[in-house]
Structures are given as C-alpha cells and as structure tokens.
Amino acid sequence: MATILLSSRLPTTGTATPSPTRPAPRFLSFPGTAIRRRGRGPLLASSAVSPPAPASAAQPYRALPASETTVLVTGATGYIGRYVVWELLRRGHRVLAVARSRSGIRGRNSPDDVVADLAPAQVVFSDVTDPAALLADLAPHGPVHAAVCCLASRGGGVQDSWRVDYRATLHTLQAARGLGAAHFVLLSAICVQKPLLEFQRAKLKFEEELAAEAARDPSFTYSVVRPTAFFKSLGGQVDIVKNGQPYVMFGDGKLCACKPISEEDLAAFIADCIYDQDKANKVLPIGGPGKALTPLEQGEMLFRLLGREPKFIKVPIQIMDAVIWVLDGLAKLFPGLEDAAEFGKIGRYYASESMLLLDPETGEYSDEKTPSYGKDTLEQFFQRVIREGMAGQELGEQTIF
C-alpha cells in the first residue's frame, strides 16, 4: 500500500518510483509492489474510457487536444463540481470524477444516480478524507494531466473545515500529483481575503501548500479560483416573497454587496484554467456580469419581477453580535456548542462583508476591481426560480433564511 507523508508543508525529501508521466512528487512514496486496498476493492463505475497516453516532457499536456487529456475532479457531486464535470466533458476532456457512495443533500443520491448524472465521466467512489484509500482507488485509472478540487465543508463547522477544506483537499493534491497531474485548479472563495472564520483559514492554509508545491517543482502549476456569491445562496427568499411575505435583510440592506456568478459560468471559468497559461500560478477572483448588488437591490429586483410593492424587514446586525457573544461564552463551557458559535459568526460575516475584491490600496471592497465573467444574471435566475422553484438549487445545510 502507498505510504503517504502528511504534514503542514509538503515535504521536499524522500524517494518515489517513477510514474508513466514523470517522477511522482517527493511527498509520495511507492513500494515496488502494486497498490492494493485492504478488504473489498473500490466501488467503481466507468464509461469504459481508457486512460490517456502520458504527455511527454517535450509535449506538455497543454499542447494536447482536450480529447487526449484526463482531468481528475474531486467534489464532483457538489453544487459547482457537477457543472465542472459537465463543462469539461462538453469541451472533450476525459474526466475522472471522485464521489461518495451516497451524495447530494442528506445523501439522497445513490451510486447509480451519480453515474447517470455525470455520464460519460469515469466515476470512482472513494473517501477523500482517507488518503491511502483515495490513492489506492485512483491508481488503476491514471495517469491524469490536471486536477480540479471542488471540495468544501458542508456547513463550515470548526473541525469539518479543517477535515475537508484543508486535509481532504491536500489528499486530492497528493493523489493528483501521484497520478502525474501537472496543473491543479482549486475552487476557493473570495471571502478568504479577510479570514475571520475557520473554513477561510483552512482554505488559505491549503493555498499556501499549493504555492509551495509550485515553487518546489517548476513543472507544476496551479490556479486558485476565488468566486463571489453563488446564485443559489441568494435565492433562499424567492418563495417566501412569492408567497406574500416581506424580504428580510440586515441593517439598511446596504452593509454588503456581491457580483453573483452562475454555476455554469463559474464552471466554464474553471475549465478555462486547465489550458490558459495566463491563469497559471495565480489567484483569480471572479464574479458574474454586471454591477455589484446589495441585499436591498436584490430585494427590490425580486419585488419588481413579481409585480409587487416592496416590503422589507430590517434586522439590526447587533442582534447577531449578541447571539454570537452568548454562543461563544457557552462554547467555552460546553465544547459541543463550538460549531453553533461558528455558524453564528458565518451568518454575521455574510450579512456584513461584501463578496468583492478587497482593494489592498484602500482597504475597501471594490466593485470596479472585481473581475466579471460570463453571461448569466441574477435577474434571469430569479425569473427562473419564480417560474420553476429552487429544484436543483437547494441550500441544504447552508440555509440561513
């Protein structure tokens, strides 16, 4: 079985047996025997697509047509991950998608559901929190040329953030490098630029690991994609307002703003990172088209689309401060309340901090300096949800309202 060395930094010493593509990274060590998983073999579903021939040193993978490249995707059943898989397939890439045996909100999707949803990608069911199992499950299906990590903790709890946003993401990097990946795309978040929450600190810690690996190995590159708000995170009140209730916001509704981006547009931007050399070894903040919108403007838009007079409930932000203060105090006495306190801080953060680029010169969030991409608008999304509901856009454990 593969021996995987974990640390807060990717080690720079050790030995490795060469892979078909190039020597495996030095933080992975392979004995001379084949990798085997204890117990039953991995649960695997495949479209019977053969692995690609490895790209030679004289012909980097970016010189190959998409049809001759394989991209590893973890978090493939998540909100953005599914669209990334579909977009890569649409562009002709071979996709190796990692999924849990039960996925979706509250694990409602079976393995057969996942295989059908991601077809014709090759799907490997594995556990990204178990580095040895992940590598063993993926090893028979390499090599890969690039990897995309769309993993994210479900609710942002303290332990879960470090388990998923850092360690499981690190396991993805280790497995991808062991399979020969020359480029790694990380789906991060624009809010990490002002890290006050555990999941932000965990994501930043991995971003450091990624940059360190690129500095160690010049043949390896990365792209860190930091999107603004997703459409679904702004759609939770559509049905409430549609049913005649007021729109709820904090303060005067102008405390924060964002340039929301659709899942399709974000997936296309992530797919661009696979081949676009200009996006290599860069942190890439990205928002959707148009100007930044405050909660007040979002609410006004929704009432206009419904043809109704605006009705708002404005909640003082100080209420959240009081709740957080109480939960923080209780968490010191009762550690089981640690996540409840963290969830309160997450709600407070999103109620008051803009999902825009933080201008280092002014220390202020900047609409103008936040890059825009794509064609889908929040207004189009609201129109669709008014007609069809939030099917496929459920918030699950991210629900605030």
From Swiss-Prot:
Pfam families: NAD_binding_10 (PF13460)
Keyword tags: Chlorophyll biosynthesis, Chloroplast, NADP, Oxidoreductase, Plastid, Transit peptide
Primary site of residence: plastid
One record GO biological process: chlorophyll biosynthetic process
Ranges of Polar residues composition bias in the record: 1-10
Pathway: Porphyrin-containing compound metabolism; chlorophyll biosynthesis
Enzymatic reactions: protochlorophyllide a + NADP(+) = 3,8-divinyl protochlorophyllide a + NADPH + H(+)
Chain residue ranges for the region called Disordered: 1-26
Keyword Transcription in annotation: no
Enzyme Commission number(s) of this protein: 1.3.1.75
Family annotation (CDD domains): SDR_a5
Residue range of the transit peptide in the UniProt record, numbered on this chain: 1-54
Annotated localization: Plastid, Chloroplast
GO cellular component: chloroplast
An example molecular function term from Gene Ontology annotations: 3,8-divinyl protochlorophyllide a 8-vinyl-reductase (NADPH) activity
General function of this protein: Catalyzes the conversion of divinyl chlorophyllide to monovinyl chlorophyllide. Reduces the 8-vinyl group of the tetrapyrrole to an ethyl group using NADPH as the reductant. Can use (3,8-divinyl)-chlorophyllide a (DV-Chlidea) > (3,8-divinyl)-chlorophyll a (DV-Chla) > (3,8-divinyl)-protochlorophyllide a (DV-Pchlidea) > (3,8-divinyl)-magnesium-protoporphyrin IX monomethyl ester (DV-MPE) > (3,8-divinyl)-magnesium-protoporphyrin IX (DV-Mg-Proto) as substrates.
Name of the featured protein: Divinyl chlorophyllide a 8-vinyl-reductase, chloroplastic
